[in-house]
Amino acid sequence: MRKNLTEIVFILDRSGSMSGLEADTIGGFNAMIEKQKKAPGEALVSTILFDNVSEVIHDRVNIRDIKPMTDREYCVRGCTALLDAIGGAIHHIGNVHKYAREEGVPAHTLFVITTDGMENASRRYDSARVKQMIEHEKSKYGWEFLFLGANIDAVETAKHYGISEDRAVNYHSDSVGTRLNYEAVSCAITSMRSGAPMSADWKAPIEADYKTRKGEKD
């Protein structure tokens, strides 16, 4: 196992409901990547954008070689095939690790899943299968999964997928909420890359903003 290597997999919603947040999403993602390029240790990045289908724009690319995402890659459209995106990514990364030499397997693997709506278009995977896959990777290999959801009950949805409450958070699907997401995720990645246990406080800024502004709206 390669101690200073971290596998980071981003599964990002680009379905039609994300319309209007393209610039915020692109800017937040790029700022996070630039910050992580300066962090110690090695990291491989995979980025899957999903709507009706999944598109892989980075497949285990050295983080220092990641070029800024643009609106050519992140253009919103279609429905929300979330389960297909998660299941396909787990299957791919799991196979890579399975057949890699011991010294090529990352010490840490983190999936970051962001969606702003309900699953409504998957055909290859269902929630039971995805839950089984996530629980297997967590228990056997220590993989971590973060779930950030807007316009849904993110904590309850994450539970259906085998992701614990302390790894799930509700956020506001707007400019402020999107920025906080990427800032918090970057801190979580830094913690994981350093080998420190991930604190449940990783989501505190997102949660505080969500509760404050939800109260204002109510």
Predicted regions and their residues:
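Acidic, low-complexity intrinsically disordered regions
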Residues: 1-218
